[in-house]
Amino acid sequence: MSRGIIIIGSGFAARQLVKNIRKQDAHVPLTLIAADSMDEYNKPDLSHVISQSQRADDLTRQLAGEFAEQFNLRRFPHTWVADIDADAHVVKSQDKQWQYDKLVLATGATAFVPPIAGRELMLTLNSQQEYRACETQLRDAQRVLIVGGGLIGSELAMDFCRAGKTVTLMDNAASLLASLMPPEVSSRLQHHLTDMGVHLLLKSQLQKLEKTEAGIRATLVSQHSIEVDAVIAATGLRPETALARRAGVAVNRGVCVDSYLQTSHPDIYAIGDCAEINGQVLPFLQPIQLSAMYLAKNLLGGNAPLKLPAMLVKVKTPELPLHLAGETQRRDLSWHITAESDGMIAKGMSGEGQLRAFVVSEDRMKEAFALLKTLSV
């Protein structure tokens, strides 16, 4: 008798995988195990909850029971997996164990919190659970410090500013989105945030946080300090690899998988934010959707290597939205930038004259798909 497929996790990657499996096989036993409630919500919405006055419960799209019934699966919410015996094909919690034929790790990623004095005062917004734990504090806060000027930090800074809060955005780098694009490209967003009233502290490093009668004192390495009501860490995500390590599966930055989404153990796979696919961590929706399509085939006996096309990444900053694609982080590209009142097109060209990356904003975003077709990958 088939022991079926076990998926650890209940986020976007896990749900996409379930849907793709059920498109091909209505009967293979499916089991979902996760530490949270398993209710569905749209994680990107967390970047806009404050300006839209949304509570954590407002984000719920589908209850876990409805999903389980719709897709014919067993579910074990609020369950912490303690160990995986890869040789015996057994997943263990403190009081239960499950046997599997194939196991999928969809354990996601956790928000990195800088290891500074007072780090316990920092909030993170990487899940509905995390938002639920701090929504009252964030709603009441008037002065907000966001640590990290990447995608999430920039999105949150705009959202809190649109909600009428006093926002300070801090980053070690000299420009926003520094790991994604050069400053001459990100400067349009940077200037817009400043015009909105966001106070930028670039080339700045946080040293410590202290609770005071007035709120929280944030002290920089430079000894400059500011008083705020809330501090949010937006300093990146770390793939959740602890279970994979305990199972004896190869791990680097994420859980190492090949083009078949297979780990170093032939019956264990990984997908989503926890996975490192041929050396790349790709925590974006489109690669996860494609991964789910291919992995479903492979779990059901197929042999389909994942092929990822050039893909758009969307920066969800509504007053100055951006789309980017290609190797925008490459330092050897020559950037050709056309900036007008209705938007910007920035093209990253190689020494051979090939289009290797681009960033478009505002009304020029409609040109993104045409540019994608000419992108060299």
UniProtKB/Swiss-Prot annotation:
Its EC number is 1.18.1.-. It is found in: Cytoplasm. GO terms for molecular function: oxidoreductase activity, acting on iron-sulfur proteins as donors, NAD or NADP as acceptor. Its main location: cytoplasm. Pathway: Nitrogen metabolism; nitric oxide reduction. SUPFAM superfamilies: FAD/NAD(P)-binding domain (SSF51905). GO terms for cellular component: cytoplasm. It catalyses: 2 reduced [nitric oxide reductase rubredoxin domain] + NAD(+) + H(+) = 2 oxidized [nitric oxide reductase rubredoxin domain] + NADH. Keywords: Cytoplasm, FAD, Flavoprotein, NAD, Oxidoreductase. Pfam families: Pyr_redox_2 (PF07992), Rbx_binding (PF18113). Coiled coil: none annotated. It is an enzyme of class 1 (oxidoreductase). Its cofactor is FAD. The keyword Transmembrane does not apply. InterPro entries: FAD-bd_OxRdtase (IPR050260), FAD/NAD-bd_sf (IPR036188), FAD/NAD-binding_dom (IPR023753), NO_rdtase_NorW (IPR023961), Rbx-bd (IPR041364). PANTHER family: NITRITE REDUCTASE [NAD(P)H] (PTHR43429:SF3), PYRIDINE NUCLEOTIDE-DISULFIDE OXIDOREDUCTASE DOMAIN-CONTAINING (PTHR43429). Belongs to the FAD-dependent oxidoreductase family. One of at least two accessory proteins for anaerobic nitric oxide (NO) reductase. Reduces the rubredoxin moiety of NO reductase. This is Nitric oxide reductase FlRd-NAD(+) reductase. The lineage of its organism: Bacteria, Pseudomonadati, Pseudomonadota, Gammaproteobacteria, Enterobacterales.
